[in-house]
C-alpha cells in the first residue's frame, strides 16, 4: 500500500470509517493529484490525494461547494468524503466504458447545456483575460511573437466585450479535457472540478472543442446538442 494512502488513512480517521480498511490501490492518471482506484473493506473507490505544489493554486473550499452543486444536478460523481482543507476526495468507483461513445460530442453538449443553464451559483469567477495575463508573465520572453499575436486577439476581444453586451457568467467546469469526462453507463460524468467557477459559456465550449479535437462535424453536433439541452442554453450560444 503506498505510503501516502497509509498516511491519509492515519491522519483522517473518517476515511477508514467510510471506506473500511484499504486493501489494494491501483494508480490512475492525474496531473495535479495522485489518484488511485482503491479496493477497501466497504467497496471500491477513487481516492484523490492532492500534490503539495497545488496547495496555493486551488481553492478547495470553492471546489467542494461547486462539486456538491454539480453532483446534485447529476453531472458529477458524488463525493463520499471530501476534506475542504487538504483537498482529499473520495468517490465511489464506477464502470468506465472501454471505448469512447460515438456520440460523445452530443452527450457532452447536452451535459454542458444543463450545467450552464442550471442557475447554480458556483463559488469563484474565471475570466479569460485574467488567465491570459497571468500566463503571459511566464511566457513573455520565450514566445515573444506568439504573445504579440495573442495581445492583438485580446484587444479585439475586449473591444467586442465592451461594445454593449454584458458579460454572462454561468456555472462552468473550467477544465474539460478528455480525462475529466468519464463515459459511464447512463452518460457522461465530469470529474476534477478544481478549476470550476462562474465563467463565460465560451470558456467551457471552446475548451471542450479544442481539448477533444472535435472535427467540424463533431463541433456542430456538440453545439447543436448544447442549444437543445434547455431553452436557456439556446440563448447562451445562438447560431452564428
Annotate the PLM regions:
Residues 2-19, 23, 118-174, 184, ...:
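An alpha-helical support segment within catalytic cores of ATP-dependent transferases
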Residues 26-130, 137-144, 148, 166:
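ATP-binding pocket architecture of kinase catalytic cores
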Amino acid at each position: 500500500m503506498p505510503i501516502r494512502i497509509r498516511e491519509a488513512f492515519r491522519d483522517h480517521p473518517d476515511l477508514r470509517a467510510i471506506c473500511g480498511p484499504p486493501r489494494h490501490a491501483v494508480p490512475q492518471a492525474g496531473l495535479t493529484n495522485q489518484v488511485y482506484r482503491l479496493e477497501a473493506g466497504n467497496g471500491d473507490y477513487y481516492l484523490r490525494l492532492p500534490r503539495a505544489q497545488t496547495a496555493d493554486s486551488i481553492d478547495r473550499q470553492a471546489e467542494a461547494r461547486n462539486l456538491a452543486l454539480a453532483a446534485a444536478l447529476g453531472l458529477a460523481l458524488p463525493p463520499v468524503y471530501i476534506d475542504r482543507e487538504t483537498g482529499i476526495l473520495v468517490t465511489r468507483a464506477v464502470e468506465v466504458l472501454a471505448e469512447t461513445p460515438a456520440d460523445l460530442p452530443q452527450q457532452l453538449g447536452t451535459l454542458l447545456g444543463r450545467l450552464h443553464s442550471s442557475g447554480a451559483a458556483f463559488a469563484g469567477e474565471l475570466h479569460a483575460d485574467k488567465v491570459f495575463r497571468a500566463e503571459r508573465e511566464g511566457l513573455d520572453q520565450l514566445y515573444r511573437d506568439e504573445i504579440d499575436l495573442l495581445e492583438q486577439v485580446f484587444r479585439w476581444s475586449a473591444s467586442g466585450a465592451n461594445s454593449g453586451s454584458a458579460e454572462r457568467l454561468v456555472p462552468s467546469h473550467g477544465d474539460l479535457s478528455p480525462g475529466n469526462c468519464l463515459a459511464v453507463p447512463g452518460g457522461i460524468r465530469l470529474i476534477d472540478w478544481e478549476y470550476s467557477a462562474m465563467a463565460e459559456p465560451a470558456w467551457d465550449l471552446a475548451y471542450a472543442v479544442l481539448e477533444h479535437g472535435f472535427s467540424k462535424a463533431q463541433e456542430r453536433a456538440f453545439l447543436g446538442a448544447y442549444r437543445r439541452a434547455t431553452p436557456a442554453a439556446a440563448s447562451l450560444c445562438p447560431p452564428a
